[in-house]
Amino acid sequence: MIASGPPPRVYWTSLIFLLLACCLLPTGAQGQTYQVRVEPKDPVVPFGEPLVVNCTLDCPGPGLISLETALSKEPHSRGLGWAAFRLTNVTGDMEILCSGICNKSQVVGFSNITVFGFPKRVELAPLPLWQPVGEELNLSCLVSGGAPRAHLSVVLLRGEEELGRQPLGKEEPAKVTFMVQPRREDHGTNFSCRSELDLRSQGLELFQNTSAPRKLQTYAMPKTAPRLVFPRFWEMETSWPVNCSLNGLFPASEAHIQLALGNQMLNATVVSHADTLTATATAKTEQEGTQEIVCNVTLGVENRETRESLVAYRFQGPNLNLSESNATEGTPVTVTCAAGPQVQVMLDGVPAAVPGQPAQLQLKATEMDDRRTFFCNATLKVHGVTLHRNRSIQLRVLYGPTIDRAKCPQRLMWKEKTMHILQCQARGNPNPQLQCLREGSKFKVPVGIPFLVLLNYSGTYSCQAASSRGTDKMLVMMDVQGRNPVTINIVLGVLAILGLVTLAAASVYVFWVQRQHDIYHLTPRSTRWRLTSTQPVTVAEELS
């Protein structure tokens, strides 16, 4: 590998040598008709490689041939009219001179050596850790060494795509800068620099060298702040949900989100979907008063933060108690509704005298109080907001069984082979067992369910409700009426006779009506006037 050009010492040595050579030439030599050929002519040589130079004198009777150069040289071979020299270490561009004697005159020939070398280093300057989408970004390619610079250029690559190309300057090391506008799709894309040494015009080839790639990370952060969702009023020592989200992030999966309550970091569950990042946590506090909850979202080199306040309060109670939850009928019962300081309680619509004091209700347990529900309402004012909490409790009263006379008739009259329900009911606490048994036979009739009534169900039944609190009895008379076949036959006979009589009467009536249409009333014959028929044909027809 070589530097961008030959050392300054080589240039100065060559220049001095050429000036001296020109000055020493005889006048006749400057107008020479003979020449010295230098081969190869204007060669392109790899840096540090040896080069064999052949000097040939085109004249009859050639004399001594020599090679003048500042480079290290050694004789290689020689013949009539020619001499070859080996340059052992070509490290820079320079002009070499071959000279010889022809007809006692000195003639010279020149050749320019061009040294080429690949860059020692091709590197893409470090990229920013994160680059905002759409903002201009300057990417720099650094190249050390390489020659000839006139044939050396630098290409910026995005993956395998060529983004730009620039010639390489002469400074050492050389720096070439390209401007790009990163896109979202450039996130995670590799960028690199490629040097190109194009020696195809010198009969060689195109030499390329690519730097190590660097990955670009792009991001997009919205201008809006995260959205916090949580209850504004928190009861102490109770867990509450906290939710924070931010839309418009890219890439959302690379963003970081934190939730904090005061100085306490919350253990949040983070989920990213499309361009949205969401954090969910549960939190509780043991400190009463106003506190701050913070949500912070970081992406790239930017962050967005939201701070909001909450109020933590202590709401003790209400506690609703019964002096006897299962009271015997007739015993006194005290109902108490109590809560913490500054809490106003109300028992069944009756408030306590002052906040912080309990409310009480006293009663004597009766059957009507069984399953009675008492309600306690507690209110607490926090920063101008009234908070409510309710409790309820049920009283059970123990009392003996009672059969409901209104629903259990003492006398029943039913038809045989019909479906009926004995609607007797009993109340009490504990719930009594009710059964109805026929006196004498202890035959049990179903209670409360449909059954088929038979003729032998007739009789007097003793219905008894029993529980651990006592018993209650009542008598029910059941009269089942059977179906009589004789009576049915008599009824059918009577109906048949009535039908015959009706039919006979109808026949007589019809006959009488028809006879009425066939009767003619005639006036007795007069001795004076002779009767003549006004309708002789009709009468004749009727008589006939």
UniProtKB/Swiss-Prot annotation:
- Cytoplasmic topological domain: 512-544
- What is the membrane topology here? Single-pass type I membrane protein
Q: In the record, which residues are listed under signal peptide?
A: 1-31
Detail the disulphide connectivity of this chain as listed in its UniProt entry.
C55-C98, C59-C102, C141-C193, C244-C295, C337-C376, C424-C463
What residues bear carbohydrate chains?
54, 89, 103, 112, 138, 190, 209, 243, 267, 296, 321, 326, 377, 390, 456
Q: Does the keyword Glycoprotein apply?
A: yes
Per the record, its GO cellular-component terms are: plasma membrane
For this protein, the record's Gene3D superfamilies field holds: Immunoglobulins
- GO BP annotation list: cell adhesion; cell-cell adhesion; phagocytosis
Supply the name of the protein. Intercellular adhesion molecule 3
Organism of this sequence: Bos taurus (Bovine)
